[in-house]
From Swiss-Prot:
SUPFAM superfamilies: HSP20-like chaperones
UniProt KW Cytoplasm keyword: yes
The family this protein is said to belong to: Belongs to the small heat shock protein (HSP20) family.
Protein name: 17.7 kDa class II heat shock protein
Gene Ontology BP annotations: cellular response to hypoxia; hyperosmotic response; protein folding
Gene3D superfamilies for the chain: 2.60.40.790
Organism of origin: Arabidopsis thaliana (Mouse-ear cress)
UniProt entry keywords in alphabetical sequence: Cytoplasm, Stress response
Length: 156
């Protein structure tokens, strides 16, 4: 007797899944939607700190193993900082060499940060040192307080 959920025989479905050929399992493991999910996780897994100083904002983004020329820093929509790039694995193919374990994420990554209104977008600087990208955005000086306007009262 097969347990049914709605109109679906649960045990038969599970049995079919367990007996699925390995190549079918491999196809589903590498399908495009899974690749998109891996990319989305990689983007979210790029750690960053945002530090506010009295005169600037500093964004420290971990970039281990990435060369400075593989990193892009941009401003989009007038107030969004975008840090993007691509981690690439060495293409050295040695015969008989294979990966036993691959934990480091490879591929494209992107982080976006909403900038505050007082960020000086004309004076942004970025430097990558020891695998950490630091983007420094100075703060605009606070606007001068408006002086009260005195209106002359006319006497009639």
């Amino acid at each position: 007797m097969d347990l049914e959920f709605g109109r679906f025989p649960i045990f038969s479905i599970l049995e079919d899944m367990l007996e699925a050929p390995e190549e079918q399992t491999e196809k589903t493991r590498n399908n495009p939607s899974r690749a998109y999910m891996r990319d989305a996780k990689a983007m979210a897994a790029t750690p960053a700190d945002v530090i506010e100083h009295p005169d600037a904002y500093v964004f420290a983004v971990d970039m281990p193993g990435i060369k400075g020329d593989e990193i892009q820093v941009q401003i989009e929509n007038e107030n969004v900082l975008v840090v993007s790039g691509k981690r690439q694995r060495d293409n050295k193919e040695n015969e008989g060499v294979k990966f036993v374990r691959m934990e480091r994420r490879m591929g494209k990554f992107m982080r976006k940060f909403q900038l505050p209104d007082n960020a000086d977008l004309e004076k942004i600087s970025a430097a990558c040192n020891d695998g950490v990208l630091k983007v420094t955005i100075p703060k605009l000086p606070p606007p001068e307080p408006k002086k009260p306007k005195t209106i002359q009262v006319q006497v009639a």
